[in-house]
Amino acid sequence: AALRVKGNHDFGTTNLLQQLITRALTSGAYEEHVQQLRKRYAKKASAMMAAIQRHIPEGVKWTQPAGGLYVWARMPARVKTALNSKLFKAALRQKMIYVPGNLCYADDPTRRKPNREMRLSFGSASIKNVEEGIARLGRALRRVM
């Protein structure tokens, strides 16, 4: 009995969980769920891009997401995005936070990490909060640009 219990812990998932996953995959429930998520995230991505058009000053470049949950931005050369930057501090004062781009790169002694990029996520935020967050980022950017 002890070997059977140990085997369940060492070699994978329980039979019940495997059966549930099989049913979700073969019934179409999983694909239906993925389609719902895609629609939800597409709406959030569109909301973020529309908010960027309304609130972000000229000179900031943005990616148009073709997938995933992030929008990447590149600031003009004079604006840095690191944790100790004026922009990061201004964003915090606006009660808004972004991920500095330099935190998203692997350490590589042969390459410098970019210091004027940021990553914004629309994955867990509501559309209302996406709009408000981009408006706050716009105010922070205007203070430092």
Named regions from a protein language model:
Residues 1-145:
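PLP-dependent class I/II
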